[in-house]
Amino acid sequence: MNRTFSLATFISAVCCSGLLLGAEPNENFFREQVAPILAGKCVRCHNDAQAGGGLSLTTAREALSGGDSGESIVVGQPDSSFLLDYLVGEKPEMPKGSPPLSANEVSLVRQWIAAGAKWPHDLTLEVKDDWWSQQSLSRPAVPSVPAAFQASVRTPIDAFVIAKLDEQGMHLSPPADARTLVRRLFYDLTGLPPTPQEMQTWTEKLTAPDSSGINDEAYTQLVDHLLASPRYGERWARHWLDVVKYADTCGYDKDKLRHHAWPYRDYVIRSFNQDKPYARFVQEQIAGDALFPGEPDGILGLGFIAAGPWDFIGHVEVPATKIDGKNARNLDRDEMVSNTLNTFCSVTIQCARCHDHKFDPYTQQHYYGLQSVFAAVDRADRVFDLDPAVEQKRQSLVAEKQNVASQLVAWQQEIQAAGGNQLAKLRQQISALHGKTRPELEVPEHGYHSQIEPVAHVEKWVQINLDHPIELSKIVLHPCYDDFAGIGAGFGFPIRFKIEIAANPQFENAQLVVDETGHDFPNPLLGTYQAETRLTAQFIRVTATKLAPRKNDFIFALSEVEVFDASNRNVAQGSVVTSHDSIEAPNRWRRSNLVDGRWPQSLDPAAVEQLVSARAQLAKLERQIETPERTSRRKQLEAEQQRIDQELGRLPSGQMVYAAATQFSAQGNFKPTGGVPRDVHVLHRGNVTSPLEEAIPCALPLPGQETAQFSLPSDHTEADRRAALARWITAKDHPLTWRSIANRVWQYHFDQPLAGTPNDFGRMGQPPTHPQLLDWLAVEFRDQGQSFKALHRLIVTSSVYRQTSQHNEAFAAQDGSNQYLWRMNRRRLEAEEIRDSILSVSGQLDLKMGGPGYYLFALEKAEHSPHYEYHKFDPSDPASHRRSIYRFIVRSQPDPYMTTLDCADSSQSTPKRDETLTALQALSMLNNPFQLVMAEAFAQRLESEANTLDDQIDHAIWLTLGRSSNETERREYATFAQQHGLVQLCRVLLNQSEFVYLD
């Protein structure tokens, strides 16, 4: 009987004697030494289900059979075995995505092969399923520390770190001095430098009465003072926005502006300042409209789903039925899914889009199940109200509208079933012909366009003055072509209309030429409507009595009206045109375009005729299958829809936020779902042209859970899907969520996370250096109110945080990356901190909070493909002197100055910023126009606040470095200022390493 062993079980298994190696190595060698290596490092990619390179290492037979490259194991010949080739070298190919085997592990495998590669035939290796981040979360016991270090234990954090250091033969560095701690806390918690007065006040308070160290009570008071500052939310919101890819433009080719993205940014700032519980913060960003109806933050938080890049061309200009359109929408949902799981759970679920995850236990079914959670939402401007009563009413009406939309979809499905194959074939024929009716070339001057109306039964007219009476032979109407709302050919052509002629502009005693007011006239597409007459007239009027539908409104539009005389000459061209009303939007729409001799003509006139015929057949069939009961039901639903729209229209206009939305104004091919989820299928190799089974809304499998699927009723709404996901993520027993956020907060205080890959807690990521500390922090945060401020307080009051950043030669030789935290990490200020600090010390910083972002560029061609011209911007503009978190962030053309200083790239998630040191940074800090303008402002401030040059220098050092100047600085800076001027000295002072680095 064969046995199957996991790594945990086979270590203790007893293997059959005689099947193992002989005395050297002994019979337990494979079981105890080699099998754990193969199971822990290799079997995940080389197993029966997923044999990477054609090689499985689960059994002796499969391992010795080899793979695509030949014999991976040549018995007795390690140097001829491909297996070892992949495991050795400076950069071993295997294990892929994981740390290489140690020299000792490679040696053990080599010994095993050399000794005969014996493997018990009844021993099967399985994937080790005990990855650290997947394990249930519980509070570890706080370790004890040696008596010599007990005085340094201020918080449980210290005990965990000191115990780990002691294991390595190291210890904490001495505590930092008061000035260093004040500056460190101000920047970490607010992102701004302390003023000279703040530095002096708090340094004095922090200094113990006997000058023996730091006054702990005063230190805690400073921490609480900074956490209560509104500047705190601005600082910590910036970290969050880095991760979620926030920007004020869409990215991709056209990089359109998002005028209403900023309310989400302000929501994040406000949430941090309010110390909102983390579970609530998460739930608002995924399903706030469903879980907290009527509350503005429930809408504002949904800006998270819309924060990332968006393909304008792929959604607006390309139909959803085209491959590029399908790809755009698939990738858009991919971004929503990956951003959600990367941010909140540190899971790289996007790796399962084209195939099952290579390293983590997630399948394509899980991935596309998550896509289906977001299948009804798009990124768009949506209305919200600060008045909770109005917001609740609006959300109630939107929910009603979604319900009606669902019933209309069901009605359409009923009609489709009743029409059978004939209806389906006609619709397919019409869809195929529609693309052939595009105009031969786009005409920018479309024609005449009436004002927009909320209902169809409104009269609109347009008339032509021929200047004098003329005997007529024919009147020809040419339809428009416009892709707005996906309409295309026949845009705005009236459903019911008439043509009249008269001798006077008042149309007294008018004569009727054509009357199409008794029935609905089919859309002529790009065909013409011709009316013959032998009457004489000076004025010709076309009157629409039933307007053409757009999206939730109605219009009357014509591209051209030709009027032919008896000699077949168009006498209307260039005539005077008047109308009941007109939108007059040159060059696109205006009255004069109606008689300019230009109109769209189809590439395939025969296709137009076929399409008109097919539509007539479709209309006839629909009249047959739409029974009186069905007609009555449709009209009731349409009336209900109109009532809801009218009630929504009567509500206050509200404010706008760019967020996840199911209701918004259509733009070209970009249309709202109305709350009805799109069909999402598992895609073979991620190919939109190869759909497989329909995806079922789900989460991800976790240990101890029987299923990842949500328990949703059959009549659930799209918001129910998002609510289920939000609840799953914030469940108390979720092992990933609480570890993820604790790791992020730790990282921003120490400039390095406990788990080195904050967005990836899977097997491709790095395990934590202090796993028990991470678990303790996660449980403490989760169980003590989920308060960010409490977690900050716990971390920054620890001795680990309060130690100096001074170098220790011996410890650095042992732990050069400081992963065991034997000192505080020194870091360069982030780009926003540098810019804000320069504004602060120069006296130019405007602390106004919230509102639309300010430009650091000149904006050109905003309506098509915006150009963001940074070199044309004047940095002396006071509107740009606010904190950097409020700047307008562009994806495709980021600010060169901020990018040089390693600012986050908003086109991708930035869980940890790079810190580089380049010549370009030095050049920018010295010569960028912003630096020059601020140096002048800094000099003016010094001259206004200090009289003598020595006092100005000392004041400048206090402002930039938070200390008094020394004798050498006063002497050398005075000499420099006398030779080159105070402004040039200020340029130098703003480039000091001590100014831009934090100890």
Q: Which residues does each PLM region occupy?
A:
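Bacterial N-terminal signal peptides
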Residues: 8-19
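Solvent-exposed helix-loop boundary motif
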Residues: 22-110, 114, 118-163, 179-184, ...
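Short, solvent-exposed loop/turn and secondary-structure capping segments
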Residues: 47-50, 54-57, 95-97, 106, ...
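Active-site histidine-acidic residue metal-binding/catalytic motifs
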Residues: 95, 252, 274, 308-446, ...
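Primarily short, surface-exposed interaction patches in extracytoplasmic proteins
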Residues: 149-184, 188-231, 246-293, 404-406, ...
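Extended surface/linker regions that mediate inter-domain or inter-protein docking
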Residues: 215-364, 370-371, 647, 786
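Short, surface-exposed tryptophan/glycine-enriched loops
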Residues: 268-272, 341, 525-539, 780-782
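Aromatic, loop-rich ligand-recognition surfaces of beta-strand-rich domains
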Residues: 443-509, 523-624, 643, 719-723
